[in-house]
């Protein structure tokens, strides 16, 4: 049986990061980069208790998140959980019947730690940050 996982961040797709930040209460950005693998600009914002928000701005029509922005005009996109081992991720994939569709791949926003993306039965995108 699996236990509760620690949520690392919630990801939001936005049309324009600068415009989004200008209209929000966010004051401190932890990290801002362009990720060539995702073809997107990414911003990591630290909240309390090591909880983060990620803003994702697709930069081309072949970005992973471009269709999401086009179809939904942005908004909540995914939840990222921290995992501590390959055994742990395999347990979650099997027990929750998750379908992995991307990764593991290095994530420049997280100092090239590996990330994997899955979808669950609720059609929610789940990201796993491999913290080992």
Task: Provide a role label for each language-model segment.
Residues 56-64, 76:
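Short, conserved turn/kink motifs that form compact alpha/beta structural patches or helix kinks used as
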